[in-house]
Amino acid sequence: MENRAMYLTTTHEDRENSSFYEESYDGMNLSKLNLCEEVNSTKYRRKTDNRCGQLDSLTSIKYAIVSLYILVLLTIFGLCIAVSKSHASWRREEALLENVTRLGEQSETLQMSLSQIPSQSDLLENIWKLESLFHNHTEQLRLLGLLTQGLERDIKDLQAFAEHTTDSVAQLWDHLSMISHSSQRNSTHLGDELASTAGSIREQDALLKTMVGNVETLQERLEDMGWTLQTLNHSLGGDVSLHQIKIYELQEKIVNVTHDTLGMKITQTHLEDQLRNEIQVLNVVTADLRLKEWEHSMALKNLTIFQGPPGPKGEKGDVGPLGPDGIPGWIGPRGLTGEKGVQGPRGLAGRNGQDGHNGDKGEVGPEGPKGVRGERGPKGEKGERGDKQGEKVEDAVVRLVNGSGPHEGRVEVLHDLRWGTVCDDVWDIKDGDVVCRMLGFRGAKEIHKTGRFGQGTGLIWMDDVACVGTEDSIDLCKFSGWGKTNCGHVEDAGVTCNV
């Protein structure tokens, strides 16, 4: 080891004992490092003196170690700053930390090896180790530089991506803000619409309740109208049957009158013929008598005077008055039946015919549904105390309403402290007699049906009244019961009493 010629390379501008570490550091030329070498203007030459001062060599080694430590610290500091500013991938960070750790371990190994230099004999060997170590460190630093450049590029890309991400986040935040404001406006608008809808629903609910009440009322009215129509149909059915019977009787009477009229017409024709013949005979007799009278008068006048010749014809006289119509001629044969003519206008209504006989009493109809109980009226004032022994008042009281006088009108009966009418089913003159006698009249002159004196209001107390005619009160007559009826007020009965 001592015979190996190793020299440090220096330029001719440097001092002879200056260290090679004072040159600019070139990592690519470390492998060509020569120790204790002098340079001439023309060529290199080795020193013949194989001794390089031990003190200068140790100083140079110490300077190299210090420079290496400073370089390593600066590299580590730069890497820490680069790593602190970025969020590179964990694999590259691990590789970088591994390289730094390895570099630190090699530096510690170098320090330990330098501290354990035993003597001048081992100096050249240590220098060779240092040269190889520098070479290894140079390669590692070059790789570290490449990794640092890649890391910087990744940091730039990461920064650009971070800026793009920041812009995207800002745009997303603006979009979210717009969506939030729009959602708030939509929520407010939706709340207003829901409030208005709730109000409309409440109004519709109130209207539906009102309509339900109206429908129930209308249904009740329709039921009442149905009962009224049934009653009216029942009554009209009886009246129609009576009218049909009367019409049939009238048709028979008309046929009989037609036959009688034809017979009388034939008789009249014969009488007219006889009168015409007798008038002709009478005219002939009258002419003969006039001629006889003229002859007698002329005979009396011509007793002494002879008749001269006739004078000239006189002027034509005036037309005399028309004589009476002649006697109609004989009836000619009946001609062919002509075509049916156009129907003429409806004639005036004829007089009401006489009331027909009462028909048989019909069957009692089904009992109607019970009506709704009315509200209780206010309590009346307390009346005066009556006599202890008073006359018994009859339960039924009768009155005549809406007539031309107290002797006629619609019959109303007082029952249960309420006035009500009487239905005209089977209403006849006997019933009217009882009512008129109750009112102090001698009897009934005429009875009336179908609301002749107007339609009453309230209840219809009595129906199917059948009096014998000798009762003192109408409530003693037979009837269907108080308030039991299938009639309407169009069938209210009336009466006209004898005054």
From Swiss-Prot:
Tell me which species this is from.
Danio rerio
The superkingdom of the source organism is: Eukaryota
The Gene Ontology CC terms held by the record are: plasma membrane
Instruction: Please give the function described in this protein's UniProt entry.
Output: Ferritin receptor that mediates non-transferrin-dependent delivery of iron. Mediates cellular uptake of ferritin-bound iron by stimulating ferritin endocytosis from the cell surface with consequent iron delivery within the cell. Delivery of iron to cells by ferritin is required for the development of specific cell types, suggesting the existence of cell type-specific mechanisms of iron traffic in organogenesis, which alternatively utilize transferrin or non-transferrin iron delivery pathways.
Protein's name in the database: Scavenger receptor class A member 5
Q: Sorted alphabetically, which InterPro entries does this protein's record hold? A: Collagen (IPR008160), SCARA5 (IPR034726), SRCR (IPR001190), SRCR-like_dom_sf (IPR036772)
For this UniProt record, the keywords arranged alphabetically read as follows: Cell membrane, Disulfide bond, Glycoprotein, Ion transport, Iron, Iron transport, Membrane, Receptor, Signal-anchor, Transmembrane, Transmembrane helix, Transport
The record ties this protein, via PANTHER family, to: DELETED IN MALIGNANT BRAIN TUMORS 1 PROTEIN-LIKE, SRCR DOMAIN-CONTAINING PROTEIN
Q: Where do the SRCR domain residues begin and end?
A: 398-498
Q: Name one Pfam family in it.
A: SRCR
Kindly give the membrane topology term recorded for this protein.
Single-pass type II membrane protein
Q: Where are the transmembrane segments?
A: 64-84
Biological process terms from the Gene Ontology for this record are: endocytosis; intracellular iron ion homeostasis; iron ion transmembrane transport; protein homotrimerization
Does the record bear Protease in its keywords?
no
Under the GO molecular function aspect, what terms does this record hold? ferritin receptor activity
Key word Ion transport present: yes
Q: Which residues lie on this side of the membrane: Cytoplasmic?
A: 1-63
Supply the PROSITE patterns for this chain.
Answer: SRCR_1 (PS00420), SRCR_2 (PS50287)
Question: Which residue spans belong to the Extracellular compartment?
Answer: 85-499
Locations listed in the record: Cell membrane
Q: Which HAMAP family match?
A: SCARA5 (MF_03070)
Positions of glycan attachment: N99, N136, N186, N233, N256, N302, N402
Q: Which family does it belong to?
A: Belongs to the SCARA5 family.
Q: Which Gene3D superfamilies match?
A: SRCR-like domain
Q: Taxonomic lineage per UniProt?
A: Eukaryota, Metazoa, Chordata, Craniata, Vertebrata
Per UniProt, residues of the Collagen-like domain are 307-359
